[in-house]
Amino acid sequence: MMTREVVLDANVIVGLLDSRDVLHDRANTLLLRLKAERAISVLLDFLVAEALSVICRRATQRRTSPPDLARVVGQHISLWFEQGEITPALSEATDFIGTCEIAVSSDGLLNFNDARLVLLQRRGVIGPVASFDESLCAVENFVSVS
C-alpha cells in the first residue's frame, strides 16, 4: 500500500494551533483521520507562515483568550522546523506570474497562497491538500481532503 501525502492548508494549521479557532475540533478530527489512514501530513513553509500571520493578528486583536504566541512558536512551529517537518516549497513555485494568473482567473476567490497550491498541484509537486476553504476545494481538478 502506497503512503499518501496530504498538504495541510493554512486554515487547518490555524485550527490545530489555536484552541479557540472555530475549526479547532474539525482540524483535530481531520488530522486523526489522516493518521488512521496512514497518510503523511505535509507542512509547506509558506502555509505555516500564513498560519502564524493569522495567529499573530489574533494575538493583538482578540480581547478574550488571545492565542499564546510563545507556545505556538515554541511548542509547535519551532519543533516542526527542528524536526525537519516543514517542507520548503517557495523555491518550487518559481512561476510568480503563473500563480498570479491563477488568482486572477479565480476572480479573486483564491489568494496568492491558494493559487500557489493550485500551481504546485498541477505541476505534480504536491498531492492532495487538506483544506476547509470551499473556494480552493472547488477549483476544477484540484484534489482536496476535508
Outline where the language-model segments fall.
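PIN-domain endoribonuclease scaffold, especially VapC-family toxins
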Residues: 4-6, 28-42, 46-110, 115, ...
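A generic structural signal for short hydrophobic patches within well-formed alpha-helices
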Residues: 13, 48, 136-137
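Hydrophobic alpha-helical membrane context
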Residues: 21-23, 62, 145
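Generic structural "secondary-structure junction" signal
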Residues: 15-19, 112-114, 138
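Metal-dependent nucleic-acid phosphoesterase active-site entry motif
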Residues: 1-24
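Short, polar loop motifs at secondary-structure junctions
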Residues: 131-135
